[in-house]
Structures are given as C-alpha cells and as structure tokens.
Amino acid sequence: MSNIPAELRFAESHEWARLEADGTVTVGISDHAQEALGDVVFVELPEIGKVFAAGDVAGVVESVKAASDIYSPVAGEVVEVNEALGDSPESLNSEPYSAWIFKVKPASAEADLAKLLDAAGYKGAIGE
C-alpha cells in the first residue's frame, strides 16, 4: 500500500504537486509511481526558465525496468530543479515525497491544483 500525504495534490499520471508558501509549486512522483518503476537510475530534469502548460512532458525518469515521462501537473515556468537527483536518483525510490524533481512558478496555481486529485481521490484512482 502506498503512502499518500494528505497535503499533496496528484495528477492521474502519478506526479504530486505541493503549493509552497512563496507561491511556487513543487513537483515529484508518487510512491505508487516509484514502486511501479523499480530502481530509478537516471532523471532527466527540465531546463530552468522552460514554460509548460499543465500536462506537458517536463522530463524523464529512467529505472532498471523502463523510462517514464514526467508531466507538469500545473502550468508555469520552471524556477528550480533538484540537481541532487543527478548524483542520487535513487532518492526518488527511498523518499518519493521529499525528493522533489522541479519547482514551477505557476500561471494559475489555484485553478490548476483544483483540477488535480486530492489524496483520497488519488488513492481511489490507484485502486487502494
């Protein structure tokens, strides 16, 4: 059973989003996603300054089993990436909710976040 923090919002494509106090949105992959992927060996991060619409491909997570696209759950500009994933991509397996991938300055955070699933909705979507 996956650990699903109540304070996060989730895309059906298994990314999580957290609205920060400074108005940015932090993005990562869910515990369910990392379990399905297996051991993560590489993360292709988006470029700082890149602008995404909600649902755009923002990067790639590669594991020993497969490569999977990462989608931006909200529209906005990438303002920070987690460079530590270059040296330790496996932290997405061990700490999926603290090992974030990128941060976005959202175009309309409230509207985009409202379209995402809450923890209970995500739990239902993954059959838990």
Curated annotation (Swiss-Prot):
Record's cofactor remark: Binds 1 lipoyl cofactor covalently.
Family: Belongs to the GcvH family.
Protein name: Glycine cleavage system H protein 2
Single Gene Ontology BP annotation: glycine decarboxylation via glycine cleavage system
Gene field: gcvH2
Record carries keyword Phosphoprotein: no
Matches recorded under SUPFAM superfamilies: Single hybrid motif
Record HAMAP family: GcvH
